[in-house]
């Protein structure tokens, strides 16, 4: 089995948040997600995320807006893009209403989402919109007119 074949079997997501409890909450929210299969890995810091991205391929990154000590997406996303990551990056935050969130495309962010908005349907939508993935036949009905 080639790496590309394995990659197609599961969408690989890197969740970057300085609070492990947020990762556990995400895993619990998406536990019932069966299609597509999703493999979620965790990084507690931007440094750890950079190491993982250099070592393996991820289809999607969900990045907490604020990582300690005080870096927000305007600092962390350029670091991810700077090492060559070209896949989709979504900024996740408890509050996405701040004015600076309107600037997210300028920093290489593809989308933003509130932590309270993430569930099975939201993740399926994100994968449909941003990740190259072979859509299952039963999803294709959603796109027919």
Predicted regions and their residues:
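Acidic, metal-coordinating helix/loop segments flanking the phosphotransfer/catalytic sites
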Residues: 27, 42-60, 68
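Alpha-helical interaction/dimerization surfaces of two-component signaling modules
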Residues: 29-33, 52, 103
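CheY-like receiver
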Residues: 120-128, 132-145
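Conserved acidic segment of CheY-like receiver
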Residues: 9-30
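Conserved phosphotransfer microenvironments
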Residues: 61-80
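Conserved phosphotransfer cores of two-component systems
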Residues: 54-56, 79-86, 107
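Alpha4 helix (beta4-alpha4-beta5 surface) of REC/receiver domains from two-component response regulators
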Residues: 74-75, 93-113, 121, 125
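Two-component signal transduction core modules
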Residues: 61, 89, 112-113
């Amino acid at each position: 089995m080639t790496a590309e074949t394995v990659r197609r079997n599961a969408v690989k997501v890197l969740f970057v948040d300085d609070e492990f409890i947020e990762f556990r909450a995400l895993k619990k929210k998406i536990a019932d997600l069966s299609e597509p299969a999703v493999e979620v890995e965790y990084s507690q810091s931007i440094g750890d995320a950079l190491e993982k991205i250099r070592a393996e391929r991820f289809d999607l990154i969900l990045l907490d807006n604020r990582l300690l000590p005080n870096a927000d997406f305007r600092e962390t996303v350029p670091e991810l893009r700077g090492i060559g990551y070209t896949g989709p990056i979504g900024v996740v935050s408890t509050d996405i209403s701040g004015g600076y969130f309107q600037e997210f495309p300028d920093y290489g962010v593809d989308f933003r989402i509130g932590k309270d908005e993430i569930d099975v349907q939201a993740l399926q939508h994100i994968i449909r919109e941003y990740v190259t993935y072979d859509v299952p036949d039963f999803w294709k009905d959603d796109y027919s007119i």
